[in-house]
C-alpha cells in the first residue's frame, strides 16, 4: 500500500447516487485511483461513438441494474480506471463447501467463522429459490432468465441433477462456490494482482480498464485464498 491509500467498499446503488452531483464527480475523479468491480464487463465497439464497457450478466449487477449502468458510464466519462473481476475468473478457483467446515474447525468455532459459513449457505439457498422460480416471477428478483435451474445445477452442482425442487435443501448437492468477494479482495493487492491475475486491457478515451477473465495459477491462488482466511482466525 502506498502512504495515504485507502480501500473503501461501496454498493453501486450508493456510488451511483453519489456520482449524480457534478461537484462530487469532480472530487471523486481527483481522489480515486481506480474502482474494483465484483463482476465482469462487456465491450461494445460503435464506429460512431467509439468503445465503451457495460455491465455483463454477473449476478451482482442484477440487484440494481440502473445503478450499475450509471456507475460504468460515469467512471468512463471521468476517466477513472475500472478493474472488473469476472465470473469466468472466479470459476477457475472454485471453493468446496467443506472449506467452510474446515474454517469453523480451525477457528475453534469462532462466531465470525460460523457467520461466514451460515452466510454462504443462506446465500446459495436464496439463489436456488430465485433460479428455480418461473420466468417473470417477482421471486427471481431481476435474476436473468438464463440463470435458471439448469444453469444452477451446472454451475454449483457439477451438472448432477438429483431433481430437487425449490423447497428442497440444496446444500448437500453443492459441489463448489465461486469466491467472487474473496477473489476481488485479493485482486486489490498489487503484488497478488500481478502474480495471479491475467486481465484483458480495454482502452476507452485513452484510459486503460481491465477485465479479469483469467487467473495464472488457479490451484496456487485457491491455496492463497484459503490460507488468508485460515490465518485471519489464528490467535
Predicted feature descriptions by range:
Residues 1-235:
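N-terminal acidic, glycine/proline-rich low-complexity segments
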